[in-house]
Amino acid sequence: MGGEGFLKRLTLTHLKESLPQGLEFSGYLKNETAYRYQNPVAFSKVLNIFQLEVAYTFIPSLRLYARTWAFYDLAYDFQDIQTIAPMKPLEFIQPPDPGEPEPNIENIREISYDPSGVLLKEFYLDVFMPSADLRIGKQIVRWGIVEGWRVLDQINPLDFTEHILRDVTDRYIPLWMVKADYYLGPLTFEGLWIPDVRGHKPAPIRSEWSQFQVLPDFNPVPRNFENSEWGGRISGVLGGVEMVYTSLYHWDDFPTAFRSVSGLGLGSLGISPEVTFTPVQRRLQTNGIGLSKSFGKIVLEGEVAYNQGKYWGTEFRAEGGASVFGEAQRDFVTHVLGVKTVLFGADLSLNFSQDIILKHVPEIQQDRIENTGSFFARKEIRYGTLVPQLLVITLINRNEWLYRPKLEFKYSDKVTFLFGIDIFTGAPAEKIPGTETLDPGRLNFFGYFDKDDRAYMEVKYSF
């Protein structure tokens, strides 16, 4: 084994040394295996990933970068798909209409899944100038100060294929855009032009992590100059305080499902009202500020944003208890406050966030104030070779929790092992007002996956 490992290292070293001047590459091979230990038990993924990063420097002021991602999930090769993605609470099987073919008995629920693929994650050209930089291409831009919170950081939409359980960089959907930075003293001025308009990507229909879906009649926003997204950011450190101001004119990443109802009042004649869904994306204007200040071992940080143009789902109770759905446009404020410190050699972080809907009315399905909290702890042991971590997120209004303890073992500079558990708690959905019946139209974000707790292991080889 020692000789084999030496030959592999020698091969990679020789390959890198033989590359043309200015060409660099790096990447990793990784296996992610997850086991759901609640009935029905199953290996929910045996995902193998190959990532390759290539950079070429033409001249010191011009650099091309690409990051590709190839994956294959072996779990579907040796397990039944209906075991990997069991039926969730409030889910039902739609029988075929007359004349339609019978469903596949091996996939009677018509579960969608993506077992393999090749993705171009990032591809951009960097232009470096004395007082400015330009980045053109497919990229990820993160504006937030408080790690992990989407208050100011709303540029790239999210991939919910695996809920929010993937690494942060894997959750962001890269967009084609132009980013320009201009440096003036302690300040950086940043501008964005984003012609690539996309929304959040839901998990495949009826897959293990399926929750929200894009409605069938949804028409994406046409990609043209008029429909582009625009953003600006000013950042810098003044008087020991990190400060950020952002402004983003963008499309809502969650399409609004406008509903029109005809035939109301005909129920007594045995005629059901007809509901027509018209999913559309709406423009939002988001302006915000972020601050961070260090006081010795304690760092206080926060962000606040004012969002204009948001549409919220509404539910009116008609005579006889029937629901009439609609939408209401209301601005909202979102903020997060955080504190970070070091205690007994451990990095600790505590955050509290609120979404506040202005001019709220009782018919809006979301609470006027939504409260969220998180706690993160991390400590390096044995010179950094062992790193235990704990992340806890709670949606306070509905008493939902996500617990993520994990242990990272750095075997060498190139080989890393990771062991962890994901635990969801909470009710799968909110109750219909005045009843004990769960409302299938108001699924909870964490509680819906209360039966999907899992243990997982990752093995990663970097080069």
Residue ranges and their predicted role:
Residues 23, 61-64, 131-134, 186-189, ...:
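Repeated loop/turn-to-beta-strand initiation elements of outer-membrane beta-barrel proteins
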Residues 31-37, 70-74, 129-131, 140-142, ...:
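Transmembrane beta-strands of outer-membrane beta-barrel pores
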Residues 439-463:
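Outer-membrane beta-barrel "beta-signal"
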